[in-house]
Amino acid sequence: MLQSLAGSSCVRLVERHRSAWCFGFLVLGYLLYLVFGAVVFSSVELPYEDLLRQELRKLKRRFLEEHECLSEPQLEQFLGRVLEASNYGVSVLSNASGNWNWDFTSALFFASTVLSTTGYGHTVPLSDGGKAFCIIYSVIGIPFTLLFLTAVVQRVTIHVTRRPVLYFHVRWGFSKQAVAIVHAVLLGVVTVSCFFFIPAAVFSVLEDDWNFLESFYFCFISLSTIGLGDYVPGEGYNQKFRELYKIGITCYLLLGLIAMLVVLETFCELHELKKFRKMFYVKKDKEEDQMHIIEHDQLSFSSITDQAAGVQEDQKQNEPFVSPQPPALADGASDH
C-alpha cells in the first residue's frame, strides 16, 4: 500500500515538473554533444597538427644549416612579423601581393560578413579608427540586419510556405500536416541543391585550389554563419573579374542566409516540431499567474494604504495638542 502511494506520488511529481525534467535533459544532452565534438575534433586533428609542427621544425633547422650567417633569433623575429602581417590579411609572397584587402568590393564583402556575424577573420581593421568604427557599425548594423532578415523571411514564408500548403489543403483536400511535411522536405531539397551543391560546383571551377568537398565545406560554413575563415573565395593571385566576383559572393551569402532562415522557419512551423519544442518550455498556468497578479496587486494596495496611513499619522503628530477655536465662537464668547 505504501509502495503504491509512493509510486503514485513520484509519478505525479514527475508529471507536474515534466517540463523542468525535459529541460534538464536538454541541457545535459547539449553539454554531452559539446564534449563529444571536442573529443572527435581533438582525436582527428591533433595528429595532423603534430605532423605539421614536426615538418616546420625540420624546415627551420635545415634553413639555418644552409644559411649559417643568419641566427635563429633573427629568423624567428622575421617569421613572427610575417605571421603577424598574415593575420591581418597581408602576405609577403610574390604571388599574393597583387590583391588589396580594402578596395571597395573587398570592403563591401567584409561589411556583409560583419553584419551577418559570419566573420571569416581573413581581413580585419588595421587602424584604431577602423576598429572603433567597426564596433559602432556592428552595434547598429547587427540589430538592423536581424530586423531586415526577420521582415524578409516573414514575407517570403507567406508566399513560399503558407500559401502553397493552404492551397493544397483547401483545393485538393489533403491533410494539412501531411502537405506541410512534404512541402518542408521538398523546400529543403531545393534549397540544398540551389545554395550548396550548385555553388560548390561553381566554386570548385573558379577556385584553383578547391575541390568539390572544400567548396561544399565553404558553402556550409558560410551559410551557417560559422565563418572559420580557412577558405575565402576571391583571394587567389590574378583572379579574373575579382570585383564582380566579390559582389556576386556577397549577394550569394545574403540570399543563401535568407533561404536558410526560410527553411528553418518552415520546419519550425510543423505541428510535430511544435509539440516537441513545447516539451522544453515552461508551461503557462493561467490560474497561477492570476493568483500571482492578485497577490502582487494586494501587496501594492496594502503598501499604498500603509503609506497613506503613515502620512496621516505624521500630519496628526504635527498638529498642536489644543486646537484653535473658530473665530465665530471666539466672538460670541466675548459678547457674553
From Swiss-Prot:
Entry's Gene Ontology cellular component terms: apical plasma membrane; dendrite; membrane; perikaryon; plasma membrane; potassium channel complex; recycling endosome; synaptic membrane
Extracellular face of the membrane: 42-103, 123-132, 203-211, 232-243
Using the UniProt entry, state the residues involved in the cross-link Glycyl lysine isopeptide (Lys-Gly) (interchain with G-Cter in SUMO), renumbered to this chain: K274
Query: Where does the entry annotate site (Part of a hydrophobic barrier that is stochastically dewetted and limits ion permeability)?
Result: L146, L261
Q: Where in the cell is it found?
A: Cell membrane; Recycling endosome; Synaptic cell membrane; Cytoplasmic vesicle
Task: Write down the membrane topology.
Answer: Multi-pass membrane protein
Q: Which InterPro entries match?
A: 2pore_dom_K_chnl, 2pore_dom_K_chnl_TASK, 2pore_dom_K_chnl_TWIK, 2pore_dom_K_chnl_TWIK1, K_chnl_dom
Explain the post-translational modification.
Sumoylation is controversial. Sumoylated by UBE2I. Not sumoylated when expressed in xenopus oocytes or mammalian cells. Sumoylation inactivates the channel, but does not interfere with expression at the cell membrane. Sumoylation of a single subunit is sufficient to silence the dimeric channel. Sumoylation of KCNK1 is sufficient to silence heterodimeric channels formed by KCNK1 and KCNK3 or KCNK9. Desumoylated by SENP1; this activates the channel. Desumoylated by SENP1; this strongly increases halothane-mediated activation of heterodimeric channels formed with KCNK9.
This protein's UniProt keywords: Cell membrane, Cell projection, Cytoplasmic vesicle, Disulfide bond, Endosome, Glycoprotein, Ion channel, Ion transport, Isopeptide bond, Membrane, Potassium, Potassium channel, Potassium transport, Synapse, Transmembrane, Transmembrane helix, Transport, Ubl conjugation
Q: What does this protein do?
A: Ion channel that contributes to passive transmembrane potassium transport and to the regulation of the resting membrane potential in brain astrocytes, but also in kidney and in other tissues. Forms dimeric channels through which potassium ions pass in accordance with their electrochemical gradient. The channel is selective for K(+) ions at physiological potassium concentrations and at neutral pH, but becomes permeable to Na(+) at subphysiological K(+) levels and upon acidification of the extracellular medium.
How this chain assembles, per its entry, is: Homodimer; disulfide-linked. Heterodimer with KCNK2; disulfide-linked. In astrocytes, forms mostly heterodimeric potassium channels with KCNK2, with only a minor proportion of functional channels containing homodimeric KCNK1. Interacts with KCNK3 and KCNK9, forming functional heterodimeric channels. Interacts with GNG4. Identified in a complex with PSD and ARF6; interacts only with PSD that is bound to ARF6. Interacts with UBE2I.
The UniProt similarity line reads:
Belongs to the two pore domain potassium channel (TC 1.A.1.8) family.
Identify this protein by name: Potassium channel subfamily K member 1
Protein species of origin = Bos taurus (Bovine)
